[in-house]
């Protein structure tokens, strides 16, 4: 069997499964890890190490901000709790937004947020101390 490039990083037990078996993830067993932006943490639920495709949960502290970045490919976000704001509008709990490749913005969470995001490729920060860094 060949080694799969699609993984849930830091989750135990998947390595022993056959290639075509479903990968069930107990999200509570995953640790939150810091992102380059203060006050925003993430749990990677699924990541394709070859293509960059990723599904992740993000926890935003009240007042935290994701600095100016570009969505290199399609990005999708569903807000589970709280709300996210950018210059185009606000997305609240229970709602969904998708952004086309090439879209650029900052985003912030005045009251905090818990979101689920799906990326075909990681975001790239465009300015400040994180310029050129991928979000992963």
Tell where the protein language model's regions lie, with residue ranges.
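A short, N-terminal "cap"/entry segment at the start of jelly-roll beta-barrel domains
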Residues: 3-51, 132-136
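Conserved hydrophobic/aromatic beta-strand scaffold that supports enzyme active sites
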Residues: 42-44, 55-57, 76, 96-98, ...
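Short histidine-centered beta-strand/loop micro-motifs
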Residues: 46, 56-58, 67-71, 88-89, ...
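Short, charged/polar surface micro-motifs in flexible loops or helix N-caps
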Residues: 50-52, 61-64, 85, 103, ...
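Glycine- and acidic-residue-biased ligand/ion/polar-headgroup-sensing regions
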Residues: 61-64, 70-86
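Residue-level marker of beta-strand positions
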Residues: 65, 95-96, 114
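Short acidic-glycine-tyrosine-enriched beta hairpin
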Residues: 85-109
